[in-house]
Regions:
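Helix-loop-beta substructure at the N-terminus of cytosolic sensory domains
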Residues: 1, 28-61, 77, 213-224
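A short, aliphatic-rich beta-strand micro-motif
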Residues: 115-124
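Histidine phosphotransfer helical core of two-component systems
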Residues: 188-191, 204-224
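Signal-transmission linkers at sensory-effector interfaces
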Residues: 1-32
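Regulatory sensory and allosteric helical modules in signal-transduction proteins
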Residues: 19-20, 50, 56-66, 71-115
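Signal-transducing coiled-coil linker helix
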Residues: 167, 171-174, 178-199
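Short beta-strand-to-loop transition segments that serve as allosteric relay/switch motifs
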Residues: 132-141
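Amphipathic alpha-helical "output/dimerization" segments
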Residues: 143-160
């Protein structure tokens, strides 16, 4: 496969992934206690100062929930989450300053001083990674397989919450559409009733007029 074809396939997949992000309609929504709680639990599980639930947009990484961090978003480059969503398995950096994948990253080499980073992808049922649940520390750490499995379980909880919210929004939309259809049907029924009443009234008036004419005709005949 040529490089151009491979790059185009990546672009198509990214377009589909971004469409999935939009489908959940969660970017730039207010803080949510259930997501905040998951981030706090993740930080406690790893005994680290920072945990983030992130969504990777086309040019930024937006934080739906964050523990131990004040910023709401960062640029997609150099964010590590943008790299983490490229794989289905958790992305693990026990010492980012020594890992060739990250040692030149500004978040590692710069003032922030990131050293430890573990991210579990937020993966949809149709196979798109929307973002990550990640934990961060400023010093190297050892991580166990059990901790990684627990982080994946928490990421699944995040996706369950997102799916529930999506289903609720769809249910509300369907209900609103049904109400609109019902109102439209009632309006049509009301208009039809008014039209029938109008036609019946006109017919009655015509019959009454004919009867009056007939009565006058009979009266004139009697007089003759």
């Amino acid at each position: 496969m040529s490089t151009a074809v491979a790059n185009r396939l990546v672009e198509i997949d990214e377009e589909a992934r971004l469409a999935a992000v939009r489908r959940y309609d969660i970017l730039d929504t207010p803080p949510d206690g259930s997501f905040d709680h998951v981030a706090k639990v993740a930080a406690s599980l790893f005994d680290v100062p920072i945990a983030i639930i992130s969504l990777v947009d086309h040019d930024r990484i937006w934080f739906k929930a964050r523990y131990g961090l004040d910023v709401e978003q960062i640029g997609r480059d150099p964010g590590l989450c943008a790299s983490a969503i490229l794989q289905t398995d958790p992305y693990v950096l026990t010492d980012a300053s020594c890992d060739p994948r990250s040692l030149a990253n500004p978040l590692v080499a710069g003032e922030f001083g990131l050293r430890f980073y573990v991210a579990a992808p937020l993966r949809t049922g149709d196979g798109h990674n929307l973002g990550t649940l990640c934990v961060i520390d400023h010093k190297p750490r050892v991580v166990s397989e059990e901790q990684i499995a627990q982080l994946e379980a928490l990421a699944a909880v995040v996706m369950d919450q997102m799916e529930l919210r999506l289903a609720a929004r769809r249910a509300v939309t369907e209900l609103e559409q049904m109400v609109a259809l019902k109102d439209a049907a009632l309006e049509r029924s009301s208009m039809l009733t008014r039209e029938i009443d109008h036609r019946v009234m006109n017919s009655l008036q015509q019959v009454s007029a004919l009867l009056s004419l007939q009565a006058r005709g009979l009266g004139n005949s009697d007089a003759a």
